[in-house]
Amino acid sequence: MTKLASGIVILALASTAIWAAPAFAQMGKSNPGSGEETRSAPGGADIKLGDAKPIAPPKIEADEASRAPILDEGKAVESFTVLTRSADGKVSRSSPSEEMRGLVIEDMKKEAGKGSMKLEKSGDPSFANEEEAGRQVFGPDDRVQIQNTKVFPFKAFGYIEAKSKTGTGSCSGTLIGPRTVLTAAHCLYSNDDGGWLTDVLFAPGLNGFEDAPFGAYAAESTSIVEGFVTNYQGFYGSVVPWDLGIITLAEPVGDTLGWLGYSNYDGLGDFTANIVGYPGDKDPPALMWRATCEVVAENVGTENFGYDCDTYPGSSGSSVYAYDEGLKQRVVVGVNIAESPEYNTAVRLNASYVALINSLWK
């Protein structure tokens, strides 16, 4: 794999200040859920899945790094303005707080891998037990099907459908709170296809269109950062650092199913990445698959990191998580967003994004 900075679009920020003390945002801790029976999905039998075309991960072309926008501190801060669309179509705008302003500027000055908060890495113990994970390998493909999606952590991962101007698309997402789902911004907003996607649904633990063990849940609202819209210059590489989205569900399904934790490890280096989602190249569709690969420190940037885990259309929005042996928890450190000629790409949960998620967490 090639060093991250050479092939992936990294946010170009004009700043001459030296790197200062690390900034932290309070991490979100995981919760395995109550295990009680879930409530009926909003709309019940009226909610139907299966008409969607998997949303392809945007491609970062080789020349896009040189065309990425160069932002000063003020523009970078304003890029973290939150845009929220409610289910009835109303869009609100929330400017960054003073705390957020400080974190964004701090993140601009950081050097990748330089920090005191380290990940005590280990493999996810769920994958060490084939019976628990219900896994099956097909041919040379290193992705693994999760057959038992009704156990934690797999019931915290879900299938997303949403409507654009030209059709219905599917992505993947992860519960990180009772009503909070983490995904990619391009699963919620299309710069090339009319803006906001509508009628967003989340089906946790989906195991094929005929087996939705926990139902499908409607979004109360969806949120992205304004930089994903205002910094777009006609090519995806111009908005890579802002490709993170939040779905707020109308129902607190996470209280029952549980959710994953999330954090900004400012000293993030080598670690084992786990990606669980719904790639669209498998038949039958809408089955849950996982991919695992090693991320090397040289491919970890301050806003993004690269890896060679297999991902396909439909995998967009999947969380990238690591197992922290010290915490004995699965911790989300990024979101799978794009592909490039050399490797796949995640937006990294830095201090700014963790604070943003905390502000929207429900």
Describe the residue ranges of each PLM region.
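Catalytic histidine site
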Residues: 152-201, 294-300, 322, 346
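Bacterial N-terminal signal peptides that target proteins for export
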Residues: 1-8
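Protease-domain processing segments flanking chymotrypsin-fold serine proteases, especially trypsin-like
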Residues: 25-175
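Catalytic nucleophile loop of clan PA
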Residues: 310-336
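Bacterial N-terminal signal peptides
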Residues: 9-17
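Conserved catalytic-core segment of clan PA serine endopeptidases
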Residues: 136-155, 161-166, 189, 194-254
